[in-house]
Amino acid sequence: LLGMIPLAISAISALSKL
C-alpha cells in the first residue's frame, strides 16, 4: 500500500497542473 503513495502524489501534482 505504501507503493501507491508516490502514484497518488504524482496524480495530485498532475491534476494541479491542469
From Swiss-Prot:
Residues bearing the modification Leucine amide: 18
Superkingdom, taxonomy of origin: Eukaryota
UniProt KW keywords: Amidation, Amphibian defense peptide, Antibiotic, Antimicrobial, Cytolysis, Fungicide, Hemolysis, Immunity, Innate immunity, Secreted
Function according to Swiss-Prot or TrEMBL: Antimicrobial peptide active against S.aureus (MIC=8 uM) but inactive against E.coli. Also shows fungicide activity. Also inhibits growth of B.dendrobatidis zoospores at high concentrations (above 25 uM). Shows anticancer activities since it is cytolytic against HepG2 human hepatoma-derived cells (LC(50)=35 uM). Is strongly hemolytic on human erythrocytes (LC(50)=40 uM).
Note: The primary structure of this peptide is identical to that of Medusin-AC (AC L0P329) and of Medusin-AS (AC A0A5Q0MU22).
UniProt similarity note: Belongs to the frog skin active peptide (FSAP) family. Medusin subfamily.
Protein name: Medusin-L1
Taxonomic source organism: Agalychnis lemur (Lemur leaf frog)
